[in-house]
Amino acid sequence: RRSTRAFLPEQVREAELQAVLEAGIYAPSATNQQPWHFTVIQKKGIIDRLSDDFKAQARKSESDYIRSVGENEKFHVFYNAPTVIMVSGDQSRHSAAVDCAAAVQNMLIQAESMGIGSCWVGFIAYLINSPEGEHYLKELEIPEGFKQIHSVALGYKRLKPANPPARKENAVNYIR
């Protein structure tokens, strides 16, 4: 699986979208709490507004890196994907972030198995969980008591991915 950052404008077919969502819904979670909520956005205007608002927020960041992302006119936080899946987590569950990460990974792998491109996008939480972005919680119908954790940009690949970068060596040791 590789991150896709160039998408065709064609919308993901409904059956494929449902298969991706089902993979997320069936992800493992601590004590089977399933502390996630998925919000599917396919309205280009909302996706673009989220990106623009993220960039405006990023330009105010104390982090040089985040500020540079916000200042990049060509950057789109969702890489112009036609579908975005926002993944929010129940704030009362101590493992919500990790459980939601498992759901995201399942969705990414399912998408790839069907030839659909995807990219894990965490930046958007920087906006949604800020005072400037909290109105999105209501607009996107994120349930009360949940906060934005991860998101997935989803769509058909515009380009074939290049060869993957080398993996770090010595990432595994064995004790037998």
Where would I find each of the regions flagged by the language model?
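Acidic, surface-exposed loops and disordered segments
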Residues: R1-R176
